[in-house]
Each structure stands twice: as structure tokens, then as C-alpha cells.
């Protein structure tokens, strides 16, 4: 097995998926950034959730807002619902794993807040319940999905935004999700604090 050849194949596959995403995603990423900035300007916050690698993405996004992205600026209110192991395990034990995010949203979410819901398949049951809880709390949802959008896509309201990666391969979807998250962070900073150029 030629490992370097395989590495080149993987890089090329990632580049091709990002090129396909470039053709379709910019309007949705822009709209998602506007939704998030509107919430932040109106004293709202952004909650985020996902499973596995998507949980890591939720935490990555939250940390970029709470700390900083590429410039010095004030901290922005963002909470990853994936980080409190005591809360997650108690909800999973006493109720079900499907409710680990929705119960937190019902407690923490307020009208005008935003939920960043991340699932490569769009079919994660606990993320679907999170979206339902966010709507109950009059929050706007930004969904990062892939494939056909799954069950998440059918739940979204007109004011929600879906950023659906045009791929069926989990790793490629995750790679574009991370790029989309970095785009959102950049656009949020530029809209709130101006361009650095």
C-alpha cells in the first residue's frame, strides 16, 4: 500500500468537496452569520450541540466566541451543551440520551437566542429534539448537516438556516463543517467589530 498516494487521495477528496460546497454554501453561511449577529446585538446567546466529532465542532465554535477567533475583542456569549458530563449523564440516566440537549435548552434558551445544531447525517435524535426545544423557546436554529439533511431539514422553519454540505462521506462533511464554523466566526467578528484591513 502506497500511504503517500492514499494521503494525496484524501487531500484531493477534501479539496473537491470544499469546491462543491463553495458553489452552494456561501448564501447560507452569510444568512447564518446575520442570524447570529442579530441575536448577539440583542443580548442573545448562541447554544450549540452535536455528537462525537460534531460535539467537538460545537465546542470549537463556542470557544472561538467565548475567547477570541483571530483578533482581540470582547468575549461573546456562547454555550456548548456538550461539555457538562454530570448534566449529560444525569439526563441520559434519568430520562434518555435523546433529551440530553433539549432539557438544557428548555432551561437555558430564551426567545431570540440561536441554536447551532450539528449532525453530519441530520438524523441524530438528540439534536432533532434540541431543534424542537429551541423552537418551543422561540429560538432560531442554524443547522449544519450533510447528505440529504435528514430529519433535521424537515423541522426547520422559514427563519432557520440550513448549511447542508453536498457530500455523503462523514469525514468530508466534518471538514466542511469546520470551515463553515471558521467562516461564521470571521463574519461575526467583521460585522460586530469591523474589518481589520
From Swiss-Prot:
The residues that the entry says bind substrate are 51-53, 64, 93-94, 119-121, 124, 174
Question: EC annotation?
Answer: 5.3.1.28
For the SIS domain, which residue ranges apply?
36-197
Single biological process term from Gene Ontology: carbohydrate metabolic process
Give the source's domain of life in one word.
Bacteria
**Major site of localization recorded for this protein:** cytoplasm
Gene3D superfamilies from the entry?
A: Glucose-6-phosphate isomerase like protein, domain 1
One example of the protein's molecular function in GO is:
D-sedoheptulose 7-phosphate isomerase activity
UniProt cofactor(s): Zn(2+)
Textual note on the cofactor: Binds 1 zinc ion per subunit.
Cite any additional comment in the entry.
The reaction produces a racemic mixture of D-glycero-alpha-D-manno-heptose 7-phosphate and D-glycero-beta-D-manno-heptose 7-phosphate.
Concerning PANTHER family, the annotation shows: DNAA INITIATOR-ASSOCIATING PROTEIN DIAA (PTHR30390:SF6), SEDOHEPTULOSE 7-PHOSPHATE ISOMERASE / DNAA INITIATOR-ASSOCIATING FACTOR FOR REPLICATION INITIATION (PTHR30390)
Task: Report what the protein is called.
Answer: Phosphoheptose isomerase
Q: Which organism is it from?
A: Pseudomonas paraeruginosa (strain DSM 24068 / PA7) (Pseudomonas aeruginosa (strain PA7))
Q: What lineage is this protein's organism placed in?
A: Bacteria, Pseudomonadati, Pseudomonadota, Gammaproteobacteria, Pseudomonadales
| Encoding gene per record | gmhA
